[in-house]
A protein has these predicted regions:
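Acidic donor-binding loop of glycosyltransferase active sites
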Residues: 102-106, 285-316
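Conserved catalytic-core segment of nucleotide-activated headgroup transferases in glycan assembly
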Residues: 39-55, 194-279
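A transmembrane-helix-recognition feature enriched in membrane-embedded lipid enzymes
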Residues: 1-15, 146, 409-444
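Catalytic binding pocket for nucleotide-activated donors in carbohydrate/polymer assembly enzymes
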Residues: 158, 302-382
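Phosphate/Mg2+-binding loops and adjacent switch elements
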Residues: 100, 482-614
Length: 747
């Protein structure tokens, strides 16, 4: 509270530090990457970019500890990840709150972030745990060794630890980490890409306008640990005064935002001419540009002729010298580089980093560097580029662990104790239902269903099969329950191509009506409705929609759909989880289709689980294919999106696949019936975000009130038609034909 009183950003971060998320997670199975502050956020950008290329459909979330890191992450990572949030305090309740909301398949920790409760709760949730860019500094090692008894069991928790250097591997082993889980992963900071860094056009123009003869950057200056240490702002500004060079532009960059005003006061007290980056004005050289903004230091390195790296003249352990090195700039550092000891040793030995023993040497060494025309800078660039490769190693490790894990649903103890008996009762009832004697229809029946409540792609799969049967000359019929229909009639029969109101069909069945490719029977008693369907039309194959647990109707082929991102829906039967029956029910299937598969994923653990349950089970994969926008093409402009689906993340992923970045989005509950007041609020938020177009799904379009378009004006609303594609589809169709003895024929 005291810290929050002094720093409003910290005060606003408190809900997040106790497990609150600033966004809604709509799909499990993503990756949570934890970075501490500014330096780790910059390294995370390269890693996230590589992971997004390999796993374009997998949700990526980033947590940070500091307010400055949070601000930079929002600025730099928004297009690379699906959400930025504050790392929870290492209390079990706060960590569990995040894990229950997010349900990641992998938690990826960067550098030396050893949080016992976060690590333990991650593994208890079913997620994998990977530590990358791991290091233990010279200064921290003695303290850690004294507490080996504490660290050894914690370091046994991660699935793998990828250390920056061979020395770090040995240090982790010394602390008790299992040897078989330790790997040499290199340093992510070497994978910095200077070509991706842009200098602020405003600053670049300002510098060009002043035509400095020399540009020196004092980067990430720090106060001392105590009074005997000194203050790098004082020490470096004294060096600036001592240099006395005509045309010198000194760019002064305090490490922390709270030091901006302190540095300005010191400049004023010394009588040094300066301007602040936030208030660019004309400056007579020699003078100082005080960088009082975040995230712009990297973009200034190309302008420099020499760089002093802060945190090295006082006992702070130093900062990363790799960024200026990649730009080919000569770098000076003081004696304190414990945080980057190996980098400092390698660069110093190669002549790529100039070390000074104290502040008195800074001014003369800078003078010498400015006369050197970049010799040590080119050495630094060459050495830094030779050390690349950590990102590729980290990506491979992350994907391997991601493939080996999927999230479990862990409820609070009081919920578990309350719901477990009800879950057992539900499971008993589900098993009992399997004992009924099924009744046959006069034609083959294909069931398309799932184990869990909620969406798994059943509707588009049924339509896909109906189109296939019509294409080969069959007359398909569809049987469906008609969820959320409000008609008092016990059933409805609708001919292919005929219209029917949503009140008579329900929203999902209305999609079948509008497709117009199959006769449709709607009702709870699907045996009775099926017979009525056959009596009315010459249907010769029936598709049973969402009927895997409807055992009264005999089926000739059971096609089970499993959502690849949450195949067992938390692993528990309703109401403890979302399973309609115990997971072993998948053994009844003739074939399984993994729906919503993500590009770059192999799902090895899921395939192994299915093989264990029923050896030889045929498994296929499907993904959503976006169709056309209705009722006409999507107009240009910023888009907002909303939906009410069992798995809203599938819609967001489809939009991303189409290259549509939404400025605002909101997920409602499955089968949501929209009220005018909700649409008015939706319009307000979308317009506030700058949207001109509102995007939704076909199912949601049907659940809008008649006056929706009028309420949403001036926004233009469009809904998306979707289909699916099935890998090895012909093999699946051949299996269905063989099982049902349907011979292929055309009209």
């Amino acid at each position: 509270l005291w810290r929050g009183a002094k720093n409003r950003d910290w005060l606003r971060s408190i809900p997040g530090r106790f497990g609150g998320l600033p966004f809604r997670v709509t799909a499990p199975g993503g990756i949570w990457l934890h970075a501490v502050s500014v330096g780790e956020v910059i390294s995370a950008a390269t890693l996230l970019r590589a992971m997004r290329e390999r796993l374009p459909d997998t949700p990526l979330y980033v947590s940070v500890t500091t307010t400055t890191g949070h601000a930079l992450a929002l600025e730099k990572l928004t297009g690379l990840c699906d959400g930025v949030f504050y790392t929870p305090l290492d209390f079990c309740f706060a960590v569990r709150r995040i894990l229950r909301a997010m349900r990641p398949s992998l938690v990826l920790i960067m550098e030396t972030e050893i949080w016992p409760n976060l690590w333990r709760e991650t593994k208890r949730s079913g997620a994998g745990l990977l530590v990358v860019n791991a290091r233990i500094s010279d200064r921290a090692l003695p303290r850690y060794v004294k507490m080996r008894w504490f660290f050894a069991p914690i370091l046994a928790i991660p699935d793998a630890i990828h250390a920056q250097s061979a020395q770090d591997v040995e240090r982790y082993a010394q602390l008790g980490a299992p040897r078989e889980r330790l790997h040499l992963g290199r340093n992510l900071k070497y994978d910095f890409h200077p070509e991706r860094i842009q200098t602020s056009p405003e600053v670049a123009e300002w510098v060009r306008g002043h035509a400095p003869a020399h540009v020196v950057i004092a980067a990430s200056t720090m106060p001392g640990v105590d009074a005997t240490d000194g203050d790098e702002d004082d020490l470096t500004l004294a060096a600036f005064e001592a240099m006395g060079l005509e045309g010198l532009l000194w760019i002064h960059v305090p490490r922390r935002p709270e030091r901006f005003d302190v540095a300005a006061a010191k400049l004023t007290a010394r009588g040094i001419r300066f301007v602040r980056r936030s208030q660019l004005e004309s400056l007579t050289l020699p003078g100082v540009l005080l960088l009082d903004t975040l995230g712009e230091l990297s973009g200034l390195f190309p302008l420099a002729h020499a760089v002093f790296m802060g945190g090295t003249l006082v006992r702070r352990g130093g900062h990363n010298v790799l960024e200026p090195a990649f730009f080919g700039k000569p770098v000076i550092a003081g004696p304190y580089m414990e945080n980057f000891a190996e980098i400092a040793r390698e660069f110093t030995a190669a002549g790529a980093l100039l070390r000074i023993a104290g502040a008195a040497e800074l001014a003369p060494r800078l003078r010498a560097l400015l006369a050197d025309a970049g010799g040590s800078g080119e050495l630094a660039r060459g050495l830094a580029e030779s050390k690349r490769g950590a990102t590729e190693i980290a990506c491979r490790a992350a994907i391997e662990i991601l493939e080996a894990n999927w999230p479990r649903q862990r409820r609070p103890l009081f919920q578990y104790l309350l719901l477990k008996p009800l879950s057992l009762l539900w499971a008993w009832g589900a098993r009992r239902k399997q004992n009924v004697v099924p009744e046959r229809l006069a034609v083959p029946v294909i069931c398309v269903g799932g184990l869990a409540m909620g969406g798994s792609g059943k509707t588009p799969t049924v339509l896909h099969l109906a189109e296939y049967f019509r294409r080969i000359g069959r007359t398909p019929g569809i049987l469906t329950r008609g969820y959320r229909r409000v008609s008092p009639a016990p059933y409805a029969l609708i001919a292919a191509g005929d219209p029917a109101p949503v009140s008579e069909t329900g929203d999902e069945a209305q999609i079948f009506v509008r497709a117009g490719i199959a006769h449709l029977g709607i009702g709870g008693d699907r045996v009775d409705v099926g017979r009525r369907l056959l009596a009315k039309w010459p249907v010769d194959v029936v598709l049973l929609d969402d009927g895997y647990q409807h055992r009264r109707l005999h089926r000739d082929f059971d096609l089970l759909l499993l959502d690849a991102q949450d195949p067992l829906s938390g692993g528990s039967v309703f109401p403890l989880g979302r399973l309609r029956e115990p997971a072993e029910g998948l053994r009844r299937a003739n074939a399984i289709v993994l729906t919503r598969v993500q590009r770059g994923r192999e799902y090895r653990r899921l395939l192994a689980y299915i093989e264990k349950q029923k050896p030889g089970m045929p498994v296929y994969r499907s993904r959503v294919v976006p169709g056309e926008w209705m009722p006409s093409a999507r107009p240009e402009g910023k888009a907002a999106a909303f939906c009410g689906l069992g798995n809203p993340a599938s819609f967001w992923a489809t939009l991303r696949l189409m290259g549509i970045e939404t400025c605002y989005r909101w997920a409602f509950g499955d089968h949501h019936q929209y009220r005018p007041a909700e649409l008015a609020r939706l319009k307000h938020h979308a317009l506030e975000a700058g949207a001109t177009v509102l995007l939704t799904t076909e199912k949601d379009w049907m659940n809008l009130p008649p006056e929706a378009e009028k309420i949403l004006q001036p926004l233009t609303i469009r809904w998306l038609r979707i289909g699916i594609e099935i890998e090895a589809e012909e093999a699946l169709l051949a299996q269905i034909r063989q099982q049902m003895k349907i011979q292929y024929r055309t009209n």
